[in-house]
Amino acid sequence: MSGLSESAQLVKQALEKRGLETPMVPNQFSREEKKEKIEHHMREILSLLELDLTDDSLEETPRRIAKMYVDEVFSGLDYQNFPKITVIENKMNVSEMVRVKEITLTSTCEHHLVTIDGKAAVAYIPRGKIIGLSKINRIVRFFAQRPQVQERMTQQILVALQTLLESDDVAVTIDATHYCVKSRGVMDATSETTTTALGGIFKSNPATRAEFLHGLR
């Protein structure tokens, strides 16, 4: 894990220890090499679908997809992109719940590679450390930017924050629409999936759990 920030290393190790890391097999290709190979294979796929890649609307599509995969929608597979984290000592002795809700996220279902569109809410009880509020949103986005299942993504965000805050007292919930359900298969356009991950006092204390969940309404 040479070259990774300390925060990225700690989070990656914590997820691997708990069996929550996204299934990945490392390779030695650079970002540009990955784009070149993805572009080549995407060109083959689109040609097999009988699309005319000489058409001016389609000729750059394989390159666009390759760039999008590596630099954007799957950028969370690379821990070099893990956000820079600011954690400060809790000198103010803040002890009440900190909740961030309505965090928008766009991810990709790892089964069909179509969109997961949703919102997350995250809360924690400050102990020894406090995290910059924007960092919570960035952590959510990092784990959304990879092929995912919603249950794992919820747990990954929880463990990442527990690791960085050095506290179990974290809660995460995600409400999302899965386009593998909406645009194919059963084609249910209105259903949403909710997943929740609770740690520490959020799991052991019904009143704290209720305060978190009630605040999401």
From Swiss-Prot:
Q: Which SUPFAM superfamilies match?
A: Tetrahydrobiopterin biosynthesis enzymes-like
> Which residues are recorded as binding Zn(2+)?
109, 112, 180
NCBIfam families, per this entry? folE (TIGR00063), PRK09347.1-1 (NF006824), PRK09347.1-2 (NF006825), PRK09347.1-3 (NF006826)
Pathway terms, separated by semicolons: Cofactor biosynthesis; 7,8-dihydroneopterin triphosphate biosynthesis; 7,8-dihydroneopterin triphosphate from GTP: step 1/1
Q: What is this protein called?
A: GTP cyclohydrolase 1
Keyword vocabulary terms for this entry: GTP-binding, Hydrolase, Metal-binding, Nucleotide-binding, One-carbon metabolism, Zinc
Q: What are its E.C. numbers?
A: 3.5.4.16
